[in-house]
Swiss-Prot record:
Catalytic activity: NAD(+) + (deoxyribonucleotide)n-3'-hydroxyl + 5'-phospho-(deoxyribonucleotide)m = (deoxyribonucleotide)n+m + AMP + beta-nicotinamide D-nucleotide
PANTHER family attached to this UniProt entry: CHROMOSOME TRANSMISSION FIDELITY FACTOR 18, DNA LIGASE
GO function term, MF aspect, one: metal ion binding
Pfam families per the UniProt record, alphabetical: BRCT, DNA_ligase_aden, DNA_ligase_OB, DNA_ligase_ZBD, HHH_2
Taxonomic classification: Bacteria, Bacillati, Mycoplasmatota, Mycoplasmoidales, Metamycoplasmataceae
InterPro entries given in the database record: BRCT_dom (IPR001357), BRCT_dom_sf (IPR036420), DisA/LigA_HHH (IPR041663), DNA_ligase (IPR001679), DNA_ligase_AS (IPR018239), DNAligase_adenylation (IPR013839), DNAligase_N (IPR013840), NA-bd_OB-fold (IPR012340)
Protein name: DNA ligase
Length: 654
């Protein structure tokens, strides 16, 4: 695009989006859909990135929300009330995770997710346990004081059993049922407009009549209240009788895709409008460290669902089996265009879904592609007035074994340890990028090598014995095979936590694997800990994880595998514990010391201490060398004890 053309387009988009913002925030009468607005804003952001010299001073990319209305007293925020960046597909989510992982170790990353309510953002301030101020977001720096109107919302507590100064933030909305009642005598375009218009009424009696609802989701400066994780913040608010969203939950990185996909199915069944899913880094201590742009924090993102739905006819229904043995039903459909891609198959999840939806071959069904991840059937195009659903599978599609069902679980399972598809998927998971990252050993390669050269995880490490045969296979030459074999050899130096995660044990994601590895140096130590007593006293390790791990290590075959892995792996970076003198202490290391940082990390871990990258309220000591810089300044400001090398050595000699 020529520069003049870009200049004109930027000017046009700025004018158009600013007008839409005025209609949305001030008039509560949007003239375009969220999708059209988002696409225009994305186009403007792209153009401004390509032509930074053409950015206009009134560009909406710099503004959060809208200016506060003149009808209300202004409310100035000490901490800006930012909006959230948006993700439209899983590539956007991956970029978000990758940016976080530049600051936060991957194994320490998990997320709190909750529905993105289509309402009006608010902040509530409490002093001595009493609600004293309430405001709308406005432009993020300055909002509208709507305290009297907030007092009319029944679910928001006016008095709380907590007497420190507290600011919480959330969303005011109107349920679908209440919106229907309101619109019997009004003409609001949607529930969001009704909520916004109601909260900005000058007559508080009207607010009381319209029965607004609210969910609270954030505590400002949580560390002042001894809160360090988002799930703790929600629990804290819930215990003070603040309304919090019951769909909020903590998920690991590897669970995000499924969670996004699952929410697409239920969001329209909720009694309020939810136009997306908010994904927040659970570790609040890292929020400030990750920073923000002028509009968005980098610790959170809002996943927006494209509402495009396609219809097609089911030509066949098949089953597949994953690495855990879980059976998934898949609908083959007549090819249909959805989100600019041709879709030929869509998931039906499990047989309960098929039965509940009354779905069979030859039915016309509606399909979505949730976040451009997994196409899925969501409903029949037209309901049938008779019962006609596809029969339940009885045998595994891979090995033919009888399928098993467990009480309280809707899925069916193949429990045959020799099932080819289960084993192939297990081997692939073990070698995948987030596990041992064995380059070249992808799914198609595992299928090529199975079962002649690889039948299980142990066989991966014997592949070198078959090099002469492997290089004779179609598509496998010397260099390709050697790269795989070299990558297998390198994998033997991975962290213990990576190996734990690679085993694919139920309920054990990357974060749980890291917590397990923090307690044990190898599998032998883990097996020696009767009933996993160490883990039972470990924060964020729940009974489901312990139960699943005990079940896994109780199998003689798995015990044999774990002993084998211990024998061939030289686990990276795990210090052998020689004393507990530093147990319960957290160190931050900064400046130039007489030995490399790794030397001191090893010593701290050997004596049962922890090492952190940033000073927080949990930091016990700052070990400082010369040229310590900003961390030393922060330590003095926060009252963190500062020690030098000599004092550190004195500590571990005690």
């Amino acid at each position: 695009m020529q520069k003049e053309e870009a200049k004109e387009l930027i000017k046009s988009l700025v004018e158009k989006i600013n007008q839409w913002n005025y209609e949305y925030y001030q008039l509560n009468k949007p003239s375009v859909s969220d999708l059209e607005y988002d696409k225009a804003l994305l186009e403007l952001e792209k153009l401004e990135k390509e032509h930074p010299d053409l950015i206009l001073s009134n560009s909406p990319t710099f503004r959060i929300g809208s200016f506060a209305s003149e009808k209300f007293t202004k409310f100035v925020y000490q901490k800006p009330m930012l909006s959230l960046a948006k993700a439209y597909n899983y590539d956007d989510i991956n970029s978000f995770i990758n940016n976080i992982s530049k600051i936060v170790p991957t194994e320490n990353i998990n997320f709190n997710i909750e529905p993105k309510i289509d309402g009006l953002s608010i902040a509530l301030r409490y002093k001595q346990g009493k609600l004293v101020k309430a405001a709308t977001r406005g432009d993020g720096s300055e909002g509208e004081d709507v305290t009297e109107n907030i007092y009319q919302i029944k679910s928001i507590p006016k008095l709380i059993n907590y007497f420190n100064d507290l600011e919480v933030r959330g969303e005011v909305f109107i349920t679908k049922n209440d919106f229907k009642k309101i619109n019997e005598s009004n003409n609001f375009a949607n529930a969001r407009n009704a909520a916004s218009g109601t909260l900005r009424q000058l007559d508080a009696n009207i607010v009381a009549e319209r029965n607004l609802s609210a969910f609270l989701y954030e505590i400002v400066e949580p560390e002042k209240h001894g809160i360090y994780y988002q799930h703790e913040a929600l629990e804290f608010m819930k215990n003070l009788d603040f309304p919090t969203n019951p769909f909020s939950k903590v998920v690991e990185i590897e669970e995000l895709e499924e969670s996004i996909s699952d929410f697409a199915e239920i969001k329209n069944k909720l009694d309020y409008d939810a136009d997306g899913l908010v994904i927040k880094l659970n570790d609040l201590q890292m929020w400030d460290k990750l920073g923000k742009t002028s509009k968005f924090p980098k610790h959170s993102i809002a996943f927006k669902y494209d509402v495009e739905v396609a219809s097609s006819r089911i030509t066949d229904i098949l089953t597949s089996v994953g690495r855990t043995g879980k059976i998934t039903y898949i609908a083959n459909i007549l090819p249909v265009l959805l989100n600019q891609t041709t879709v030929k198959a869509a998931t039906l999840h499990n047989h309960n879904f098929i039965k509940d939806m009354n779905i069979n071959i030859n039915d016309e069904v509606n399909i979505i592609k949730a976040g451009e991840i997994i196409p899925k059937v969501i409903s029949l195009k037209e309901e049938k007035n008779y019962v006609d659903y596809y029969k339940k599978a009885t045998n595994c599609p891979s090995c033919g074994s009888q399928l098993v069902e467990f009480e309280g679980i809707v899925d069916q399972f193949c429990t045959n340890d020799e099932c080819p598809d289960k084993n192939i998927n297990n081997i692939y998971h073990f070698a995948s990028r987030n596990c041992l990252n064995i380059v070249g050993l992808g799914l198609s390669t595992v299928k090529d090598f199975y079962p002649k050269f690889i039948k299980n995880i142990k066989d991966i490490f014997d592949l070198h014995k078959y090099r002469a045969e492997l290089i004779k296979l179609p598509r496998y030459r010397d260099l390709k095979v050697d790269n795989i074999l070299n990558s297998i050899e390198s994998a033997k130096n991975k962290k213990f936590s990576k190996v734990i995660f690679a085993l694919g044990i139920k309920h054990i994601g990357q974060r749980a694997a890291k917590l397990i590895a923090d307690n044990y140096a190898n599998f032998a130590e883990l097996l020696d800990d009767h009933n996993l007593l160490k883990l039972q006293n470990t924060k964020n390790i729940g009974p489901k994880i312990i139960e699943s791990l005990i079940e896994f290590i109780s199998s003689p075959a798995n015990q044999d595998l774990l002993a084998f892995l211990d024998a061939i792996f030289n686990y990276e970076g795990k210090a052998k514990v020689i004393s507990t003198i530093l147990s319960g202490y957290t160190f931050v290391i900064t400046g130039v010391l007489s030995e490399p940082r790794s030397h001191f990390v090893k010593l701290i871990e050997e004596h049962s201490g922890n090492v952190s990258s940033a000073i927080s309220s949990k930091t016990s000591y700052l070990l400082a060398g010369s040229d310590a810089g900003s961390k030393l300044e922060k330590a003095y400001k926060t009252g963190t004890k500062v020690i030098n090398e000599e004092q550190f050595y004195d500590l571990i000699k005690q």
